[in-house]
């Protein structure tokens, strides 16, 4: 049962809810998100004295609607919760009460907050969740959380967090260093939530709109082996971008991930041999997720260390080169026609700015009719099988709509944020830094390509271009 309380600090009042089974440390991390006062500097006064980190909140006599006093000064974050290296850009970003709702950090929960904001960037998925009928479980709590985020005020996702930890206990892991909850891997949170939604939504929305298909061929590398190549079909919810010492572009990393060397037993040779497994996409979904494989297990430190290499990613992705020849043949005519339409649109826009003369109504009507004809031609080129495949991308072209970034040196430390494109203004992106929401220009997103411990892209969300 959640208990509503208020906290007074430096003349300001903060309303929040607490869970009796949580500790004083959890409350202090909530207050840090609201006030920027680091937990170790906070003095929260309760009945009997100062609130201790390891004490259960339900044991100190906090009553509903009680007002507690907090003392402490805001300052730099402690080393256990490092500030991203690019935090100085904050002053260049504007703020407005009309921005989307942020999520309060409940103690190393930025991995969850950024994942929720990324999922929320898919409005059709939110619509599918709103139709979920069950009254219990993680999806029901996610539905409630989405409803509470309709306003612009920051939201405390406590009930959703509790449900997440109940269904996936790994997210309840405690940190040996701080004694509070440990930082978690946002990619694991993303994958887990998607798999839960995939199983739970009766409309099969995730399967239709976010799941792609792979056709893989495995062949022995040794020439003397007369083995027939084996063919397999797999489904994927995320496309890995492998990062080697030679990877400079996301498309390179994806292609590297689609080609693997595998050692396995050969029945013909009666021993282990090297095989090449080459995969190509046989179905492209409406929403394509790309995961930068930036973390690897480093035994010397006992953690997932981070690959800091700079890897450029595109705002517009042409996925045709990742596809099977059969699918590519279906996509290319539509892709080329759509690009032609977009090029014409850009030329008309530049010409209008150059001459600075408003076209007449007749000219506007003629231009609109011409564009409708081009769109109709493009739609007529869509392969019938792709047209009947609900949730499939018939063009192979995508726009970048979301980035989940990580700042820090390992998956179990640092800070996660979400960057979501403004659907009303392509030149602007919303930056979700837990409860703090601000606007950044599209140029800022280009700097998330890595090269150090500052914010670097970890999960990218692409949306299929519309033929319209």
Curated annotation (Swiss-Prot):
Top-level taxon of origin: Eukaryota
GO MF terms held by the record: cysteine-type deubiquitinase activity; metal-dependent deubiquitinase activity; proteasome binding
Keyword Nucleus applies: yes
Coiled coil ranges: none
Annotated localization: Nucleus
Annotated GO CC locations: nucleoplasm; nucleus; proteasome complex
PROSITE patterns (UniProt xref): UBIQUITIN_1 (PS00299), UBIQUITIN_2 (PS50053), USP_1 (PS00972), USP_2 (PS00973), USP_3 (PS50235)
Family: Belongs to the peptidase C19 family. USP14/UBP6 subfamily.
Oligomer and partners: Component of the 26S proteasome. Interacts with rpn1.
Role noted for this protein: Ubiquitin-protein hydrolase is involved both in the processing of ubiquitin precursors and of ubiquitinated proteins. This enzyme is a thiol protease that recognizes and hydrolyzes a peptide bond at the C-terminal glycine of ubiquitin.
Protein name per UniProt: Ubiquitin carboxyl-terminal hydrolase 6
